[in-house]
Amino acid sequence: MLPSAQAPSLLNPTDDFAALGNIAWLWMNSPMHRDWPVHLLARNTLAPIQLGQYILLRCNDVPVAYCSWALMDADTELSYVMAPSSLGGNAWNCGDRLWIIDWIAPFSRDDNRALRRALAERHPDSVGRSLRVRRGGDTARVKEYRGRALDAAAARAQLDRYHAELIAGLRASNGGYAPRGRGTA
């Protein structure tokens, strides 16, 4: 129990600890996450829990799916893409560029679809991106998403602008970076 002399917090420790436990349980059931070190669990979950930047879905009081996101500025986005482990502290909420950091739905495609719907409802007017790494792989690719209320053409224009800025930043910081897939910016 916390001492009564401690200043009150806007966070509810009981709810935060419960969320962390539910998320840890999902990590243990995820083929991709289960062998990751505990420090990655802390690094990737504590900030979004404290900031409320996550969705946790439950079915019959059992956690079935989880995602978290960061809202980055262009510089933080560049650092994150170059070194995903660089995400820390204020980087989780320093801009308006939505990046999905974790996506765990280990039990069914229905849970995955429900999580996608919940995220689209939570961010109806946003485009988002994520770094997607296949299990056992070491190369990430950028996946793109758009909210339900966002016009497809407006979303494409915004994503193309973000993509061009990211490619320019990567080239400037990494010399001969050459993107694969979508061509050059």
UniProtKB/Swiss-Prot annotation:
What domain of life? Bacteria
Which UniProt keywords are present, listed alphabetically? Acyltransferase, Cytolysis, Cytoplasm, Transferase, Virulence
Name the principal localization, coarsely classed.
cytoplasm
GO biological process terms on file: killing of cells of another organism; toxin metabolic process
Q: What is the effect of changing R141 to L/K?
A: Does not affect ability to activate CyaA
Q: Name one GO cellular component term.
A: cytoplasm
Effect seen on changing A140G: Reduced ability to activate CyaA; impaired ability to palmitoylate CyaA at two sites
Return the EC number.
2.3.1.-
The answer to keyword Transferase applying to this record is yes
Q: Which residues form the active site?
A: H33, D102
Which Pfam families does the UniProt record give?
HlyC
Where does the record place it?
A: Cytoplasm
Q: How does it assemble?
A: Homodimer.
State the function annotated in the UniProt record.
Answer: Protein-lysine palmitoyltransferase that catalyzes palmitoylation of the protoxin (CyaA) at two internal lysine residues, thereby converting it to the active toxin. Has strong preference for palmitoyl-CoA (hexadecanoyl-CoA) substrate, compared to other acyl-CoA substrates such as myristoyl-CoA (tetradecanoyl-CoA).
Query: What name does UniProt use for this protein?
Result: Protein-lysine palmitoyltransferase CyaC
Q: Which organism is it from?
A: Bordetella pertussis (strain Tohama I / ATCC BAA-589 / NCTC 13251)
Q: What is the lineage of its organism?
A: Bacteria, Pseudomonadati, Pseudomonadota, Betaproteobacteria, Burkholderiales
Task: Please state the gene responsible for encoding this protein.
Answer: cyaC
